[in-house]
């Protein structure tokens, strides 16, 4: 990567840690991020068989709070936060423009009755924050905490024992798409039972001040369980194999949730939200293209369960060849 380009990119608080353990860094969404450590195939297979640790601190965290918080969230997303969320619950949802196009797909965490955290894609943070602020007619408080948050993921069959040895929380009791606040080696963390690999896994949020110490503890535990650090290359092959879409690549503002097999995350009956009228019209006319992402989708919260994830080996192998060619070039 040219030096002048590298200097213009954002870096996570774990940048120097990645350099120390030999990561190959690339530009992604305005960030300088690890694409691989050992090699993409090895990292991919290690997540499938054991456990991998990921730095996802380039993702965005936007907190909406106050008396008008829920009303604003309901207006912004297609899914039904009011009807489905309680404290500690997580909801997947598209966020659409008036034409029904997907501005972003995100996770909504209910931290309290009047406090929600939206986790958005890295390349969309600024645009999403401005969009949310522009539609804040309910005097909610909106805070972009992205630069002050470190997000580390553990994904794979051994992620439970990797995390449990360090946590004061019984992580086996955290159900899929739920979270709990706790301590990991005395560091305050949100422990979220979520992931983007199609495996058992957790995503861990903490203040950026504690990020390096949290990584060090989790990294040592991961290695002890036979795991590896994993870059964005294997993260992409893992999500492709699991059939999970990437905003900006598979879905964007030119595609609607109905076209993207995301109708399970659209609640037309909940009341008004941005894009609702366009989606109602599209549903009635059925005049739209369709992508086969989720052949077995059915859960009202998120359909990505271990029992129904398709194993897309052909996509995995094809992408690995492409990714390795690009990494070597």
Predicted regions: what is each one?
Residues 9-15, 26, 32, 136, ...:
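Glycine-rich, acidic
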Residues 255, 260-329:
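Glycine-rich, small/acidic residue-mixed loop/short-helix segments
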Residues 1-93, 101-103, 233:
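Acidic, proline/glycine-enriched N-terminal capping motif
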Residues 85-91, 125, 172-180, 303-305:
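Glycine-centered loop/turn motifs
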Residues 52-78, 90, 145-164, 286-296:
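Short glycine-/aliphatic-rich beta-strand segments at the starts of folded cytosolic domains
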Residues 68-73, 126-128, 160-163, 210-217, ...:
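Short, conserved charged micro-motifs
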Residues 46-57, 102-115, 142-145, 185-201:
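Residues forming anionic-ligand binding surfaces in small-molecule and nucleic-acid pockets
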Residues 83-135:
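Well-ordered mid-protein domain cores that form the structural environment of catalytic cofactors
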């Amino acid at each position: 990567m040219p030096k002048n380009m590298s200097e213009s990119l954002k870096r996570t608080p774990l940048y120097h840690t990645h350099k120390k353990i030999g990561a190959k860094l690339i530009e992604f969404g305005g960030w300088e991020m690890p694409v691989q450590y050992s090699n993409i195939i090895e990292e991919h297979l290690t997540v499938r068989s054991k456990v991998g640790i990921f730095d996802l601190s380039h993702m965005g965290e936007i907190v909406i709070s106050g008396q008008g918080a829920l009303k604003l969230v309901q207006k912004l997303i297609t899914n039904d936060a009011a009807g489905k969320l309680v404290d500690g619950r997580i909801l997947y949802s598209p966020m659409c423009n008036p034409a029904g196009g997907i501005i972003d797909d995100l996770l909504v965490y209910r931290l309290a009755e009047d406090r929600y955290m939206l986790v958005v894609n890295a390349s969309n943070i600024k645009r999403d924050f401005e969009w949310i602020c522009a539609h804040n007619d309910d005097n909610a408080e909106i805070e972009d905490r992205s630069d002050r948050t470190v997000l580390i993921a553990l994904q794979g069959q051994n992620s439970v024992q990797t995390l449990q040895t360090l946590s004061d929380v019984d992580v086996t009791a955290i159900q899929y798409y739920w979270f709990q606040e706790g301590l990991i080696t005395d560091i305050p963390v949100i422990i979220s039972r979520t992931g983007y690999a199609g495996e058992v896994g957790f995503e861990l949020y903490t203040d950026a001040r504690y990020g390096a110490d949290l990584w060090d503890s989790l990294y040592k535990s991961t290695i002890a369980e036979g795991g590896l650090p994993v870059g964005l290359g294997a993260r992409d092959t893992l999500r492709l194999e699991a059939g999970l879409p990437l905003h900006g690549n598979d879905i964007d503002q030119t595609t609607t949730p109905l076209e993207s097999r995301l109708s399970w995350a659209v609640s037309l009956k909940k009341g008004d939200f941005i894009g609702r009228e366009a989606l109602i019209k599209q549903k009635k006319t059925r005049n739209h293209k369709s992508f086969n992402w989720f052949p077995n989708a059915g859960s009202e919260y998120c359909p990505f369960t271990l029992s129904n994830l398709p194993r897309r080996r052909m996509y995995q192998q094809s992408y690995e060849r492409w990714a390795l060619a690009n990494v070597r070039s």
